[in-house]
Amino acid sequence: MAGHSKWANIKHRKGAQDAARSKIFMKLSKEIFVAASGPGGADPETNPSLRLAVSKAKAQSMPKANIEKALSKASGNSKNASEFKELIYSGSLPGGAIILVICLTDNLNRAISNIKAAFSKIGGQLGKSGSIPYIFERKGVLDILKEEYENSDQLMLEALDAGAEDVQTFEDFSRIITNPSNFQEVKDKIDKALSLENYATAEIQYLPNTTVSFEKEKLEKLETWIETLEDNEDVQEIYHNIDF
């Protein structure tokens, strides 16, 4: 994708957060709660899944008090956390858009029913549950706004030296791509080398290999549809190949 498209996607996500901050934090709290209640325990230093969830929350500017509350809630509540199940659905929309929806739900029937209704409303088709379309690759993503670093060349060198797969530099930010298996290791090394604290994005994502473009009117309709689906309490993440 072009740099503008990547940055537009970041701004789109941040705008959605500003408009419904409490819902975003609720989803992040649920993710932290489930990770902390698992076999890895409530210590991010010894629980990779929890550490990833906390890094993601911090990148979304979730207050420290909210994170600590979710961690505290997890203590002794593993039974409640076990009721949450991950559900992955992929589907296609008219015009060639591919959508990947990841849910974390304590009610599978409700989640499935809502996802099916959303795709039906826009004329889309759902694929098999649990399948990841071939156009998506699972990658670690670190987005760093330009004001957070002084020299893009130094950032690139430090990131590649830390084990990053790729570094993409754009007008307003840089994107560091990693293998999911060494995401936290790369992030820790970059943090130490450049004294970085703030990220626009710090999480594992499904990135599309190709994108599709739409005319403005259709694009606005798709954006509204995605935002409505994001508001669903069971939906944690939505990935797509639309060039916004």
Curated annotation (Swiss-Prot):
Domain of life: Bacteria
Protein location: Cytoplasm
InterPro entries: Integrase-like_N, TACO1_YebC-like_2nd/3rd_dom, TACO1_YebC_N, Transcrip_reg_TACO1-like, Transcrip_reg_TACO1-like_dom3, YebC-like
Pfam families per the UniProt record, alphabetical: TACO1_YebC_N, Transcrip_reg
First and last residue of the signal peptide: none
Molecular function via GO: DNA binding
Cross-referenced SUPFAM superfamilies: YebC-like (SSF75625)
Gene Ontology annotations for the cellular component aspect, listed alphabetically: cytosol
Alphabetical UniProt keywords: Cytoplasm, DNA-binding, Transcription, Transcription regulation
Biological process annotations from GO: regulation of DNA-templated transcription
Main location class: cytoplasm
Sequence similarity: Belongs to the TACO1 family.
HAMAP family from the UniProt entry: Transcrip_reg_TACO1
NCBIfam families from the UniProt entry: PRK00110.1, PRK12378.1, YebC/PmpR family DNA-binding transcriptional regulator
Name used for this protein in its record: Probable transcriptional regulatory protein MMOB1910
Organism the protein comes from: Mycoplasma mobile (strain ATCC 43663 / 163K / NCTC 11711) (Mesomycoplasma mobile)
